[in-house]
Amino acid sequence: MQTITFGLIATSDRASSGVYADEGIPALKNWLGSAVKNPIRFVEALIPDEQAEIEAVLRRMADDEGCDAVFTTGGTGPALRDITPEATLAVIDKEMPGFGEQMRQISLYYVPTAILSRQTAGIRGRCLIVN
């Protein structure tokens, strides 16, 4: 079976500065490990909520690291520093709005504040990027 390469990016000012441990990347690794039967290679980044840095890491993972898909955690809410969707939209070739719509719909069953999420997704080259 072909190895699938997943990029995992956690955007958080506090976790990236060591205030608390990131839980997003371990949760994604656990979920992907149980959902995907192919061998998996992970490329990881824990970075602050800085649009230029998020854009650079998304480009690196899609263009240089050969990621088949990149998943981000954090930075999709309405707070001023939540800019992950803007960074994603800046680097993708095609937007895939159905991903965000579906994730919000499912999340609303569990968390009423899911409606505040600005999740998006898109394609860069041959890489799917999902917030």
Residue ranges and their predicted role:
Residues 1-131:
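Non-catalytic beta/alpha edge segments that cap or flank active sites
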